[in-house]
Regions:
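A compositional/biophysical signature of low hydrophobicity enriched in polar/charged and small residues
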Residues: 1-158
């Protein structure tokens, strides 16, 4: 089912603050709390809302470095791709991994306590022949100017 104006407003509000009360949501979309809760549950059931998470203050956790790694695989065989992607999924330091177009196959965002840990991590990946990594190009984050807080939503059709 295509989201209507009220659904899009709910999605926008919940992307900004997943702890917004049903009462506050209801007031914002001018529906009863029961009707609003039903809409939220429907959006969850339809997969438009996939979960709720806390936004953690990275600086409060202590010093960390964030690295963006462009990774090229030696080949595109399904077994190689599956092993590589499973490794990225298992690595706690990998906070995001995107398959991309261009000269590299993946863009990986990695968060480590220091460069030594990043080096240890990537050396381990390169030494694991089964992962099929040909090349890693590293870009260190100097400053986060805008962090991801939610997807842009389409305009309502009515």
């Amino acid at each position: 089912m295509e989201p209507d104006r009220a659904d899009l407003k709910l999605l926008d509000l919940l992307q900004r603050d997943g702890r917004t009360t049903v009462q506050a949501l209801a007031e914002a979309i001018h529906l009863s709390p029961r009707a609003t809760l039903n809409r939220v549950r429907r959006l969850e059931a339809e997969g438009l809302i996939q979960g709720y998470r806390a936004l953690v203050n990275r600086a409060a956790l202590g010093e960390q470095i964030v690295v963006f790694a462009e990774i090229a695989l030696k080949d595109q065989r399904q077994a190689t791709v599956q092993r590589f992607e499973a490794c990225m999924d298992r690595s706690a330091e990998v906070v995001a991994c995107y398959q991309i177009s261009g000269p590299y196959d993946y863009l990986v965002r990695i968060c480590c306590p220091d460069l030594a840990r990043y080096r240890e991590l990537t050396d381990g990946w390169l030494d694991d022949v089964g992962l099929g990594i040909e090349k890693i190009v590293t870009h260190t984050e100097w400053q986060t100017l805008k962090e991801f807080t939610g997807f842009p939503l389409p305009q309502p059709k009515n």
